[in-house]
């Protein structure tokens, strides 16, 4: 992605993984570049919740933005739905009890599962982990809508159970049933590394400079089919901020002592808020995570 403004691009800010760090989000929204333009749009790359101290408050804050906010689902957002459905048990690092103990828990979860896996607008794609190398934008959107239909149905709890278990590493249009659903959702919410022929390596260590032999970031797979449309994503705090012509990773680890990043599509401007921008009484996020 170059640094030249795109004529006609609406005023949209894409915001990285919040992870329940509502103080970071409030500090970011208070920045004059955003606060002084109340009509600007706010895109969230997913993982609004979990690991941080205020998952319920974060959901309510984003819900309160109304139509200004566009949110795609991340793996931690799905984690809350999986726990609610009884398909997994909470882990020691999960910080979702404030959602489950809230009087409006049903409203919060219903709002969450109504979010999308992919959004495309203003010549950009928004998704949590990325777009599988074998998919062009139209194919990816069709598959996202297919999975979203299952997540939004009355039998959504059964869908969350169906997501448990392994999935194929390689994509085939012939996949069906639970295997197809797991692959689609895994690609949109968990993918980081692939082999050169596009097989996902979901369990591989994804630390830059230490990729397992034979793997590379999904966005560097040769002949990736969605390379002509810039993709905004998160999910990869160890990769950190990455801005190129074709992709931008906006997960800058606010929940582990880093910063929360916003990226303006119009002119590629970056905003970041870190711990020094938080109220004095706020609990350091890194210590909360360490003790979780």
Task: Indicate where each model-derived feature is located.
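Acidic, His/Gly-rich catalytic cores of divalent-metal-dependent hydrolytic chemistry
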Residues: 141-292
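A short acidic-Thr-Gly-centered motif at the start of a beta-strand
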Residues: 1-8, 35, 62-64, 117-120, ...
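N-terminal active-site segment of His-dependent metallophosphoesterases
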Residues: 1-61, 65, 78
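Active-site neighborhood of divalent metal-dependent phosphoester bond hydrolases
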Residues: 56-59, 63-179
């Amino acid at each position: 992605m170059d640094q030249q403004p795109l004529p006609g691009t609406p005023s949209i800010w894409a915001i990285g993984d919040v992870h329940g760090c509502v103080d970071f989000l409030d500090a970011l929204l208070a920045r004059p570049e955003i606060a002084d333009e109340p009509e600007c749009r706010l895109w969230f790359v997913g993982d609004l919740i979990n690991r941080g101290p205020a998952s319920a408050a974060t959901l309510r804050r984003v819900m309160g933005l109304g139509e200004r906010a566009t949110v795609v689902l991340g793996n931690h957002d799905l984690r809350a739905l999986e726990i609610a459905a009884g398909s997994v048990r909470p882990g020691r690092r999960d910080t979702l009890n404030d959602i489950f103990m809230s009087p409006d828990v049903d409203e919060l979860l219903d709002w969450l599962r109504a979010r999308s896996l992919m959004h495309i607008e203003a010549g950009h794609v928004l998704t949590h982990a990325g777009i599988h190398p074998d998919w062009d934008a139209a194919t990816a959107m069709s598959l996202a809508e297919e999975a979203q239909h299952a997540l939004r149905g009355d039998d959504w709890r059964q869908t969350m159970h169906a997501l448990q278990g392994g999935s194929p590493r390689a994509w085939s249009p012939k996949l069906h049933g639970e295997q197809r659903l797991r692959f689609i959702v895994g690609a949109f919410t968990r993918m980081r590394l692939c082999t050169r022929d596009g097989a996902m390596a979901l369990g591989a260590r994804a630390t830059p400079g230490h990729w397992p032999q034979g793997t590379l970031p999904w966005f560097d797979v040769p002949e990736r089919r969605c390379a002509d449309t810039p993709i905004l994503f998160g999910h990869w705090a160890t990769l950190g901020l990455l801005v190129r012509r074709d992709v931008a990773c906006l997960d800058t680890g606010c929940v582990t002592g880093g910063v929360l990043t916003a990226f303006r599509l119009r002119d590629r401007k970056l905003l970041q808020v870190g711990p020094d921008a938080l109220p004095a009484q706020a609990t350091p996020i890194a210590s909360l995570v360490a003790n979780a």
